[in-house]
């Protein structure tokens, strides 16, 4: 089975009466010439790393090697525990986890690139928060990761998941789309609703540039992970409510590629424009590198 079209994956799943995750697990086992149990176990290890990366990123005092970032997940969690959040506990918890994982990455900890290190907090925060709120068993989260991976493969095949190729829309956009589709399946949505969630998430972030201060995956990347999980939640909520994307997911992916191709190289991970070249951005760069 090819992974070059979200619509084809959805059609195949519907034809066979399977969830996207079930279809992908069977397909990947066949491609890898391994059993489904072996593929499941491998994905389960990724889930464990995701959980560990959340805990590691909650450290109040741990700072990145550059000294630019650290402690924000702790601050956000304190606000959440104190009932000071605006958007409610679910989104608050998701933000905490997204920032925590991204901080773990900035501190050279172990994360799951999902699909990249720069966007590593979005998928885990979405799924682990949903698990916490709805008491979902690990096995269901592992299966949802197969759904997410399929969306990621299609995006990587037809566009890119790299900031250097397509800007942050490719990194945080892909992660948001993956998370949105996975959440929809976990909440009982259909494969078609997963497709709509993917499309909506990508549309919401189309055109976002990659402009890391000092060329490091910290500013604004860590906070963009919090924004990315928010985007995924919006897309999943809309899709589960029956809201459909007028533009199919596959066409949105192609549009994202075209937008990325039109972006100046200065806006694609080179730290030569955007926030990286603001007066404060330059000062922070000098602080790190002298």
Tell me what each language-model feature is.
Residues 1-109, 133, 242, 249-290:
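Generic N-terminal targeting/processing segments that precede catalytic cores or assembly contacts
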Residues 37-49, 89-96, 106, 121, ...:
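Conserved active-site and cofactor/substrate-binding residues in soluble primary-metabolism enzymes
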Residues 86, 113-120, 132, 136-137, ...:
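Glycine- and small hydrophobic-enriched segments that form the cores of compact globular domains
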Residues 88-105, 140-159, 204-212, 247, ...:
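Acidic-glycine-rich active-site phosphate/pyrophosphate-binding loop
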Residues 103-128, 169-174:
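Glycine/serine-rich anion-binding loops at beta->alpha junctions
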Residues 124-135, 180-188:
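Alpha-helical support elements that line or immediately flank enzyme active sites
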Residues 146-178, 182, 204-231:
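A structural-propensity feature for long, helix-poor, extended segments
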Residues 185-290:
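Functionally critical mobile loop/hinge segments
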């Amino acid at each position: 089975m090819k992974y070059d079209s979200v619509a084809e994956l959805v059609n195949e799943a519907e034809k066979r009466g399977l969830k996207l995750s079930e279809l992908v697990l069977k397909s990947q086992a066949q491609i890898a010439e391994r059993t489904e149990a072996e593929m499941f176990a491998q994905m389960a290890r990724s889930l464990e790393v995701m959980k560990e990366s959340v805990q590691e990123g909650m450290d109040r005092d741990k700072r990145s090697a550059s000294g630019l970032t650290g402690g924000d997940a702790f601050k956000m969690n304190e606000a959440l525990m104190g009932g000071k959040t605006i958007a409610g506990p679910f989104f608050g918890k998701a933000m905490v986890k997204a920032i925590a994982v991204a901080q773990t990455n900035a501190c050279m900890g172990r994360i799951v690139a999902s699909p990249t290190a720069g966007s590593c907090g979005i998928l885990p925060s979405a799924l682990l928060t949903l698990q916490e709120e709805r008491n979902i068993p690990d096995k269901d989260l592992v299966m949802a990761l197969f759904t997410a991976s399929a969306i990621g493969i299609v995006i990587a095949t037809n566009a890119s998941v790299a900031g250097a190729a397509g800007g942050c829309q490719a990194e945080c956009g892909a992660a948001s789309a993956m998370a949105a589709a996975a959440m929809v399946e976990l909440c009982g949505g259909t494969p078609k609703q997963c497709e709509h969630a993917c499309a909506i998430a990508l549309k919401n972030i189309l055109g976002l540039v990659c402009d890391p201060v000092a060329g490091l995956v910290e500013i604004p990347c860590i906070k963009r992970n919090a924004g990315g999980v928010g985007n995924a939640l919006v897309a999943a909520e809309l899709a589960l409510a029956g809201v459909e994307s007028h533009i199919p997911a596959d066409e949105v992916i192609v549009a994202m590629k075209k937008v990325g191709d039109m972006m100046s190289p200065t806006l694609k991970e080179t730290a030569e424009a955007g926030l990286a070249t603001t007066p404060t951005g330059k000062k922070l760069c000098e602080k790190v590198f002298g």
